[in-house]
Curated annotation (Swiss-Prot):
Cellular component annotations (GO), alphabetically ordered: cytosol
Gene expressing this chain: phnX
Listed InterPro entries: HAD-like_hydrolase_sf, HAD-like_sf, HAD-SF_hydro_IA, HAD_sf, PGP-like_dom2, Phosphonoacetald_hydro
Active site: D15 (nucleophile), K56 (schiff-base intermediate with substrate)
Cofactor dependence: Mg(2+)
Annotated family: Belongs to the HAD-like hydrolase superfamily. PhnX family.
EC numbers for this chain: 3.11.1.1
Name this protein carries in UniProt: Phosphonoacetaldehyde hydrolase
Reactions catalysed: phosphonoacetaldehyde + H2O = acetaldehyde + phosphate + H(+)
Amino acid sequence: MNYNNPTQLQAAILDWAGTVVDFGSFAPTQIFVEAFAEFDVQVSIEEARGPMGMGKWDHIRTLCDQPQVAERYRKVFGRTPTDDDVTAIYNRFMPLQIEKIAEHSALIPGALETIANLRQQGIKIGSCSGYPKQVMDKVVALAATNGYVADHVVATDEVPNGRPWPAQALANVIALGIDDVAACVKIDDTVPGILEGRRAGMWTVALICSGNALGLDYEGYRALGSDALASERKRIHALFEGSRPHYMIDTITDLPEVIADINKRLANGEMPQSS
């Protein structure tokens, strides 16, 4: 029995917020701010966006480890945040997130058409998120009412380690019956999500305008002038550079051209690990 390189993509593993739904990835960001505020600790939107893509407990832990946030917490409680404190914030975050997730559940413009295009090519649609299953169940149900149903969904608490570990992406590979990770592409708007795909041995595509890095809603994105947009693209490209995405595009609507290019590279014998 011999190994043969895959010659075309079999699966696309899509992130959720900032990739398929919730242009600008506002749902989790605003709730982090509100959850900390209930403990009388101020966290800015910009600070809350920093660790985006990680599981939500890990996200809160990372925020609490930032010196300025830890100092604000110390001024209120007389100590820096422990893991028990992180869990307390997380336990407040969860019901707030579930309560308000519907406010940011709209599909990103062009997502349905792009996903339909992938399926017409025989590409399966896997998905994963930094949300825990309790939140994902609601996100999935809301997306279904808008016409989007992924072939598989993996929440961050359904694997031993969430992003940037590769477990969620690999769980999709197993569930979808994909025979080679090199026949998969991971699409995400965060650095941890791109690292997840890289570590899983997949092709990776970073979305630079629809998600956390730009942090604007669709109308704000469309209103950017050409110079401002070029400046933001340059800034965000630099943010993603260290995670080594194979491609960087504005939104999911630009994905079909990338898929065609990956299939061409696979047909020529190129593998994601070699670039």
